[in-house]
Amino acid sequence: MKPIKALTARQQEVFNFLKHHIETTGMPPTRAEISRELGFRSPNAAEEYLKALARKGVVEILSGTSRGIRLLVDTEESANDEDAGLPLIGRVAAGEPILAEQHIEGTYKVDADMFKPQADFLLKVYGQSMKDIGILDGDLLAVHSTKDVRNGQVIVARIEDEVTVKRLERKGDVVYLHAENEEFKPIVVNLKEQPNFEIEGIAVGIIRNNAWM
């Protein structure tokens, strides 16, 4: 990847808001939300700032969705630190910690502090169930390990030995894991009947699927 070019103060404000919005809601903001938060006169002004950030290599704009904004990561920031990097999690065995050594397929030179809150591991995305918020097949999802999650956040959950990325809705003892693709029905988990359900963390960012080629 190319190194990130210096941002103007206003561009940095926009970028910081994008990161904050993804951190707190699990998805990018719309142009209208950016305009409202930062005091732009119209969503068109927000669009111009997004285009500027895209030209500088810090975001990617995806067509076809109002929330089609993806943060990109400059791996060169951690290139001189041999110990820097995030583990990539592969297949997970039921009953074992997700970060157990046997689950780690490799380590990627990514600065964990690029994500807020800090990322603890990467998970490869399979399928198109979250495509409407820009999480695509083959992407690497940056995940912050935590059990402290809120309704509406995009989480990484484990059911037996299956790991899934979905938006959380919990009502009492029933958990609904919602896709961001109308072709997929929610996964419904009754916590009283399914003891092998674990929340592994929240999504804090995406590395696009061709960033390492």
From Swiss-Prot:
Entries under InterPro entries matching the protein: LexA, LexA-like, LexA/Signal_pep-like_sf, LexA_DNA-bd_dom, LexA_repressor, Peptidase_S24_LexA, Peptidase_S24_S26A/B/C, WH-like_DNA-bd_sf
Keyword Transport: no
DNA-binding region positions on the chain: 31-51
EC numbers: 3.4.21.88
Protein name (Swiss-Prot/TrEMBL): LexA repressor
Residues under site feature: Cleavage: A94, G95
Primary role: Represses a number of genes involved in the response to DNA damage (SOS response), including recA and lexA. In the presence of single-stranded DNA, RecA interacts with LexA causing an autocatalytic cleavage which disrupts the DNA-binding part of LexA, leading to derepression of the SOS regulon and eventually DNA repair.
GO MF term set: DNA binding; serine-type endopeptidase activity
Organism: Mannheimia succiniciproducens (strain KCTC 0769BP / MBEL55E)
Enzyme active site: S129 (for autocatalytic cleavage activity), K166 (for autocatalytic cleavage activity)
Family membership noted in the UniProt record: Belongs to the peptidase S24 family.
Any single biological process term in GO: DNA replication
